[in-house]
Curated annotation (Swiss-Prot):
Gene3D superfamilies: 3.30.70.260. It comes from Pseudomonas fluorescens (strain Pf0-1). SUPFAM superfamilies: YbeD/HP0495-like (SSF117991). This is UPF0250 protein Pfl01_4965. It holds the Pfam family DUF493. Belongs to the UPF0250 family. The lineage of its organism: Bacteria, Pseudomonadati, Pseudomonadota, Gammaproteobacteria, Pseudomonadales. GO terms for cellular component: cytosol. HAMAP family: UPF0250 (MF_00659).
Length: 91
């Protein structure tokens, strides 16, 4: 590793208010499907779920906050969401 390379910050677990942002196609029921998938893996703070549509209405961003317990949990959430076919990105 050179001096100019930057390491990703290490996440310390558990994180009780870990933000997850999901960018997906806009579609009926997609928000509920996203929440159901995440709830299979983590507790969600239901009071902190936010939904926004893109200016043209093609995409929807869902931001929610979870209790993150480990890296495997985050990987599994990401993998299952991406496998839906309508989720484009998980941040």
């Amino acid at each position: 590793m050179t001096d100019t390379e930057v390491k990703a910050p290490k996440i310390e677990f558990p994180q009780v208010d870990y933000p997850v942002k999901v960018i997906s196609d806009t579609g009926v029921g997609n928000k509920d499907k996203i929440i159901d998938i995440v709830k299979k893996h983590a507790r969600i703070n239901d009071e902190r779920v936010d939904e926004r549509q893109s200016s043209n209405g093609k995409y929807t961003t869902i931001q929610l906050h979870i209790v993150a317990t480990d890296q495997d949990q985050l990987y599994n959430i990401n993998s299952e969401l991406r496998a839906t076919g309508f989720v484009h990105m998980v941040l």
